[in-house]
Amino acid sequence: YGEGFYTFFMEVTRLSDSVDLLNITVSERLISNMDLSIGKEIIVLGQLRSYNKFVDGSNKLILTVFARNIEPCIEKSKNPNEIFLDGYICKEPVYRKTPFGREIADVLLAVNRAYNKSDYIPTIAWGRNSRFCQTLEVGDNIRVWGRLQSREYQKKISETEVVKKIAYEVSISKMERVTEESLNNEGHEDT
């Protein structure tokens, strides 16, 4: 379509002062007269997209925020990194306990969008939400609220070699299973 796209990384600081490094994709048309120099504070609204990229001999799932709007940040938000997803479980959730005793569940969500496309989004649930994930089955429709996070981890390549990698995932703070009943009740207030 003759439209160019740019990608860049954006740092978002959590309440804990940890920093998430988010991958942003934006049309040149959205940023033609903007100053996006390093250190500029901006607000990005968009959709989380995924695609496979062949890297180092294997496919890697890439997550990017496809920007719909970018504007200068005038006033900082208390919760600057929020996401909502409505999708379908496409792989059996994996529940486990970490070496520190935290309960977590990895859930892969397929989120449908226009033109018969889907984005596959890795998510992670904690505590009681991770236990709830044990009741979910492939094909279940769920809604999740949370934040997009980047997490550094060590991958063991051999007995002597370890490489540093970054995982991108949605950290779930609230979730619900979508049922016929919940769909029928939407938009109806109890009086």
Where are these regions (language model features)?
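Single-stranded nucleic acid-binding surfaces, predominantly the OB-fold ssDNA-binding core
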Residues: Y1-T191
